[in-house]
Amino acid sequence: MLNLKRGIGTHEPSVISLGQVWVDIMLNVDKVPAQGGFAVADHPKPSIGGSYRVLQAASRMGVPTEHAGILGNGLWAHFIRQSFQDNGITHIGQDRLDEDSGFRVVLSSGAPQKTFIASYGAEAHGDSDTFDTLEPQPKDVVHISGNTLMDHTATGVDGFLLKAGTDPAARDYTLVINPTNTLRLVNDHMLEDLVLARPVWSCNRQEAMTLAERLGAPIDDSKVTIGGG
């Protein structure tokens, strides 16, 4: 793998994502076929998914944005890199030369729930040293998404959390966790290290309830207030 290093000579506070980025391929079908069936999809539309949306939103607000996750080498990775370039997002993470980035096929039939088929790629195949070279600078915001907490790359996130320590006042950057709906699948060890890091938790109501249940915290629904969710 190759690493890209951050220049810190004249640093401007940035949003840094440790999350995974992949390509979503949206397929609209009349009905999701049963096993052995057949369906015709209208207007297939590839787009960038995962933590890309957070980076894109921050960039549109005029904030420098950096992706510290892994990108691969191939068709999908090229699509991601081009989207980064078009949206002012800098990739500072590892480059995996022997594997493409992954993709998700998303089947939508008009039903409330979509059907997902995932092909994991370079983004999911990190290890304990994936984020070793990342050194957040003063006033940076480091964003960790739930999609990075369940596969090989999670060991790298865990290493970063241990380096971040347990006292937010001792850090000169802000650590934000967006657990997504995968929080119920995160293993106990990882959840413990997330909690001990004392980050800012960015949750909707369902995610906040799941977190409370995982931690064994009492829930009084009448007193639960979730801003924006």
Listing of model-derived features with the role each one plays in the protein:
Residues M1-I70, L75-F79:
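Glycine-rich phosphate/adenosyl-contacting loop at the front of the ribokinase-like
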Residues L2-V21, Q82-R96, S108-G229:
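Ribokinase/PfkB-type carbohydrate-kinase core domain
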Residues E99-G102:
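Short acidic/glycine-enriched loop/turn segments that link adjacent beta-strands
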